[in-house]
From Swiss-Prot:
It comes from Streptomyces coelicolor (strain ATCC BAA-471 / A3(2) / M145). Its cofactor is Mg(2+). It comes from the Bacteria. InterPro entries: NUDIX_hydrolase-like_dom_sf, NUDIX_hydrolase_CS, NUDIX_hydrolase_dom, NUDIX_hydrolase_YfcD_pred. Keywords: Hydrolase, Magnesium, Metal-binding. The keyword Phosphoprotein does not apply. This is Uncharacterized Nudix hydrolase SCO1686. Residues 35-175 form the Nudix hydrolase domain. A motif (Nudix box) lies at residues 72-94. Belongs to the Nudix hydrolase family. Signal peptide: none annotated. Gene3D superfamilies: Nucleoside Triphosphate Pyrophosphohydrolase.
Length: 181
């Protein structure tokens, strides 16, 4: 994103309940008015299968300061989910040359309080070093999934990430951790 434009000024496609574009709005307006838009969630794992977990900075526009087990963000106006997944993964992980994230599934997130977005979930393997954006990430680490599970009751996680994680676990079914990708 252009350094002169704040994240609140980013233009997003506004979509209906079937994920069809019905208009556009500034990101800040979309959140303030509860307009449905698009987001990507990227499940990033290292070669050992550990999950990238991070704590969001207190300056984030939405859900400041909790932890998240996904990297990702909003899909810009006219941008595809696939392109947004790669862009967000590279930006938030601070890693270039990542393989294109693999699309897993899509769901409609709605917290019932005006936060609603179509959410495309992806997975990517991160072979090299990461250097997350200090503006986005206050802490990070690659955790074994069993440790992540243990932290769910101890750390505050973003609600949309928890929803995506529950759906990811259901999507994987009984095959267990590490079965995706």
């Amino acid at each position: 994103m252009d350094g002169l434009m704040s994240s609140a000024d980013e233009i997003l496609d506004i979509v209906d309940e079937n994920d069809r574009v019905v208009g556009q709005a500034r990101r800040g307006d979309a959140y303030a008015r509860g307009l449905r838009h698009r987001c990507v969630f990227v499940w990033a794992r290292d070669p050992e299968g550990r999950v990238f977990v991070h704590r969001r900075t207190a300056t984030k526009l939405v859900f400041p300061a909790p932890y998240d087990m996904f990297v990702g963000g909003v899909v810009g106006a006219g941008e595809s989910y696939d392109d947004a997944a790669l862009r967000e993964a590279e930006e938030e992980l601070g890693a270039s040359g990542l393989p294109r994230p693999e699309f897993l599934f899509k769901f409609l997130y709605d917290d019932g309080a005006g936060r609603t977005w179509w959410s495309a979930v992806y997975e990517v393997r991160v072979a090299g070093a990461v250097s997350p954006q200090v503006e986005e990430v206050a802490w990070h680490g690659f955790l074994p999934e069993a440790e992540l599970e243990g932290r769910l009751g101890e750390w505050e996680f973003v609600p949309d990430g928890l929803s995506a994680y529950a759906r990811l676990r259901a999507w994987r079914g009984a095959s267990g951790p590490g079965s995706v990708g």
